[in-house]
Amino acid sequence: MPSCLDSWAVLAWLDGEEPAAAQVESVIGGERPLMSWVNLVEVHYRVARDHGAAEADRVLAELRRAVAEQLPGVAAMREVATIKAEHPIALADCFAVATASAGMATLLTGDPEIVERAGELPCEVSDLRPRR
């Protein structure tokens, strides 16, 4: 099954947070996981805020080589709206879920809003957080 990354997974990878970083690195090394442009924007602004625009641009260029970017169309927007209407999760997270669902992919994340609702969402979810 293909994989889909959300911003939580990518930011954990960039920060070297384990076990997420190793899992994301493994996926990127073996395939081009899906990623919504909305989630790419989220990564870009977070890196820009913490490390500056030049670093954010460098990270975006690296990600664009590593992932299969998904620009949401009308069908995706409807799916995102349905997910947002039915679940109390952030809008960007809804884009990640919809992207994974449309691509029949497993969403790699550690975002509690998504992980805690995994059984209710229209895609498989893999929790990248450390086991307790």
Can you annotate each of these PLM segments?
Residues 1-35, 48-58, 132:
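Short, well-structured N-terminal submotif of metal-dependent ribonuclease cores
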Residues 5, 35, 71, 91-94, ...:
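Short beta-strand scaffold positions
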Residues 9-10, 39, 76, 96, ...:
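Alpha-helix capping/helix-boundary segments
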Residues 13, 69, 107:
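Conserved SAM-binding loop
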Residues 40-68:
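Active-site-proximal, substrate-binding regions of enzyme catalytic domains
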Residues 42, 79, 116-117:
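Phosphate- and divalent-cation-binding pockets in alpha/beta enzyme and binding domains
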Residues 64-86:
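Acidic catalytic patch
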Residues 66, 97-132:
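Acidic, PIN/NYN-like endoribonuclease modules and their adjacent C-terminal/linker elements
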